[in-house]
């Protein structure tokens, strides 16, 4: 399992590179990468284990964030009620956004990132709804429609695969100005 010391920090060139496509079947190394990224998210979302291992809680972790420039990210968006199944949980490989809404969505508190240690205030406008195509660890192709928070999380992780960080989207002059009709998500 990854620890915070394993997370690549802002300033490392791998975070600004376009990641390479992943080929199938997955190598043993890529299978371990996928498993370890998801394990980090699972452990980080358990308050006791998060504290024990001194982790920062996360809902997504992209391969470049652990120093591997490959198009792979683990996403684990929990349900509001912990007894329900997650809103989205999978390792997305070679993801492509095939369609997106005209309407934007943004988190009211802004976004954060395991690779960015400082707080960067401001709204990060993203498409409120997306259709995502990706392969899972078995190479099977999935096409899913996501909206609101799960859509935002997946766009954030896909940005990592293209060398983009969340704060690149923040309006530098008016950080808390969002496009008209933006859905604000708390």
UniProtKB/Swiss-Prot annotation:
Record CDD domains: Pep_deformylase (cd00487)
Alphabetized UniProt keyword annotations: Hydrolase, Iron, Metal-binding, Protein biosynthesis
Organism domain of life: Bacteria
Cofactor info, note text: Binds 1 Fe(2+) ion.
Catalytic reactions of this protein: N-terminal N-formyl-L-methionyl-[peptide] + H2O = N-terminal L-methionyl-[peptide] + formate
Enzyme Commission number(s) from the entry: 3.5.1.88
Pfam families, alphabetized: Pep_deformylase (PF01327)
Active site location: 157
Cofactor dependency: Fe(2+)
InterPro entries named among the record's database cross-references: Peptide_deformylase, Peptide_deformylase_sf
Gene Ontology MF terms: metal ion binding; peptide deformylase activity
Residues that, per the record, bind Fe cation: 113, 156, 160
GO biological process, alphabetically ordered: co-translational protein modification; translation
Functional note: Removes the formyl group from the N-terminal Met of newly synthesized proteins. Requires at least a dipeptide for an efficient rate of reaction. N-terminal L-methionine is a prerequisite for activity but the enzyme has broad specificity at other positions.
Protein family according to the UniProt entry: Belongs to the polypeptide deformylase family.
UniProt name for this protein: Peptide deformylase
Gene transcribed to yield this protein: def
